[in-house]
């Protein structure tokens, strides 16, 4: 059976100019995937060569949506007035069972508000969270959540995030009990604000996750945890700082290779090492954050994503469809709730 992904083709800073070529790249690479491009049909059709229309056949479909959500548009306004936006129609396709997942590079707040309104949260989950993968000092990734969906969270919210993150990490890396860390300003028990301290007590009391204790910001990337949990305010700061550092490394590397010819000659032996380093920290490679905890799969691409980065976001959606992540979360949460009821 084909895995069908709906793409908000008008979303992001570059819209169809990035999303259509990325879609064609995905279809070439993944023969068992169907993509639905949602947006202004006349604009989208112009960007698809006739040879691709013929070769991909029914695996490539366009569904017209007359409106688009602006990157600075208030979420409440988009939800209330843009009922025929490419974003809303793409999410509706997931709700109606015509698509297994939705990917958008559009306005994050509007996407979260619309996805939550249309799809609703899974039973036992109070709030969805944004989760994404980050590189570590070895080839294994660490997944961090919440990256900005909830500025204010409760200890119970953080616990639910931990459960969901554990399930996703387990599926992604084929590990039985992913290590869960709670982000804090220190490893000592006395450190942290009230939210973190109470969440720590809750994590230790409930033995349903492999909780390893506090993780500091400077050890997120040291492969001591598979999942790091925090509230959305802190998580978004971690995300933006990490992206900034990665871009700084890339920029310095490019500047080094734009120096005089003798500098380039001296750097020649280091080129393979630098390329590996740049590849490992490249934000494009890790593009694709998931709105975890919804009755459906919604993946958020960075608004400024290029073709390569948007492809990565779509591949994250394909992976989650393969593993049926929402169903795994639903089953695990139901199992945990049943355990608590029996105690």
From Swiss-Prot:
Entry's Gene3D superfamilies? Isopropylmalate Dehydrogenase
Q: Where does it localize? A: Cytoplasm
Q: Which Pfam families does this UniProt record tie to the protein? A: FA_synthesis
Q: Which Gene Ontology cellular-component terms appear in the entry?
A: cytoplasm
EC assignment: the record states 2.3.1.274
Record keywords: Cytoplasm, Lipid biosynthesis, Lipid metabolism, Phospholipid biosynthesis, Phospholipid metabolism, Transferase
Pathway noted in the entry: Lipid metabolism; phospholipid metabolism
Q: Which GO terms describe its biological process?
A: fatty acid biosynthetic process; phospholipid biosynthetic process
Ligase found in the keyword field? no
Q: Where is it mainly found?
A: cytoplasm
Q: Which HAMAP family match?
A: PlsX
Q: Which family does it belong to?
A: Belongs to the PlsX family.
Q: Which PANTHER family match?
A: FATTY ACID/PHOSPHOLIPID SYNTHESIS PROTEIN PLSX, PHOSPHATE ACYLTRANSFERASE
| NCBIfam families xrefs | plsX
Stated name of the protein:
Phosphate acyltransferase
């Amino acid at each position: 059976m084909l895995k069908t992904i709906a793409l908000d083709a008008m979303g992001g800073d570059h819209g169809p100019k990035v999303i259509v070529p990325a879609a064609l790249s995905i279809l070439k690479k993944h023969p068992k995937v169907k993509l639905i491009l949602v947006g202004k049909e006349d604009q989208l059709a112009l960007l698809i060569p006739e040879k691709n229309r013929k070769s991909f056949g029914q695996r490539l479909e366009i569904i017209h949506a007359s409106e688009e959500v602006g990157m600075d548009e208030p979420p409440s306004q988009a939800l209330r007035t843009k009922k025929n936006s490419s974003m809303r129609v793409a999410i509706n396709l997931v709700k109606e069972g015509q698509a297994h997942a939705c990917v958008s590079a559009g306005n994050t707040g509007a996407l979260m508000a619309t996805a939550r309104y249309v799809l609703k949260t899974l039973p036992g989950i109070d709030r969805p969270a944004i989760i994404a993968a980050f590189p570590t000092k070895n080839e294994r990734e660490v997944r961090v959540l919440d990256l900005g969906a909830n500025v204010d969270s409760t200890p119970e919210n953080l616990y639910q995030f931990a459960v969901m993150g554990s399930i996703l990490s387990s599926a992604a890396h084929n590990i039985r009990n992913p290590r869960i860390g709670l982000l804090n300003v220190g490893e000592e028990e006395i450190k942290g604000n009230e939210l973190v301290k109470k969440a720590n007590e809750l994590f230790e009391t409930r033995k349903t996750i492999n909780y390893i204790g506090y993780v500091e910001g400077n050890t997120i990337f040291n492969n001591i945890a598979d999942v790091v949990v925090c509230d959305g305010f802190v998580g978004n700061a971690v995300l933006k700082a990490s992206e900034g550092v990665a871009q700084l490394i890339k920029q310095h590397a490019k500047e080094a290779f734009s120096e005089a010819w003798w500098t380039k000659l001296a750097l020649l032996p280091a080129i393979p090492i630098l390329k590996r380093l740049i590849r490992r920290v490249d934000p494009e490679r890790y593009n694709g954050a998931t709105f975890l905890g919804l009755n459906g799969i919604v993946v958020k691409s960075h608004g400024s994503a290029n073709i390569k980065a948007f492809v990565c976001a779509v591949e994250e959606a394909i992976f989650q469809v393969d593993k049926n992540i929402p169903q795994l979360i639903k089953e695990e949460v139901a199992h945990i709730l049943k355990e608590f009821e029996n105690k």
